[in-house]
């Protein structure tokens, strides 16, 4: 499976925007002034850590909107489509890296059980 991350702000081509407004968007931000309603965390790393916990919770509790978005990306990637997740952070650390990790980790079953 090929999953890449592209920077939307820089005009890099992407197949799927995963920023705020998308079911997989990060509800946490280290940017206090431009958070667009996101919950503030002191650093980028803490915002990504909080996102990892949030995404794990969504999967474990079978949030259909989130789980279906992950399933769709995994099925398309398994089918040979090159997935390019669009965000505004790349190449800096980003929640899209967590999304890619969860999709590629086939031990994680979206909706049935969660090993992570």
Predicted regions and their residues:
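Catalytic phosphate/metal-binding cores of nucleic-acid and nucleotide-processing enzymes, i.e., regions
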Residues: 1-116
């Amino acid at each position: 499976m090929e999953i890449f991350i592209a920077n939307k702000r820089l005009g890099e081509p992407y197949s799927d925007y995963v920023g705020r407004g998308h079911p997989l968007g990060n509800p946490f931000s280290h940017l206090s002034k431009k958070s667009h309603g996101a919950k503030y965390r002191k650093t980028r790393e803490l915002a990504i850590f909080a996102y990892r916990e949030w995404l794990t919770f969504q999967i474990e509790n079978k949030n259909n909107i989130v789980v279906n978005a992950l399933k769709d990306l995994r099925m398309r990637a398994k089918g040979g489509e090159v997935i390019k997740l669009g965000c505004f952070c790349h190449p800096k650390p980003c929640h899209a890296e967590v999304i890619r990790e969860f999709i590629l980790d086939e031990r994680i079953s979206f909706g049935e059980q969660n090993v992570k």
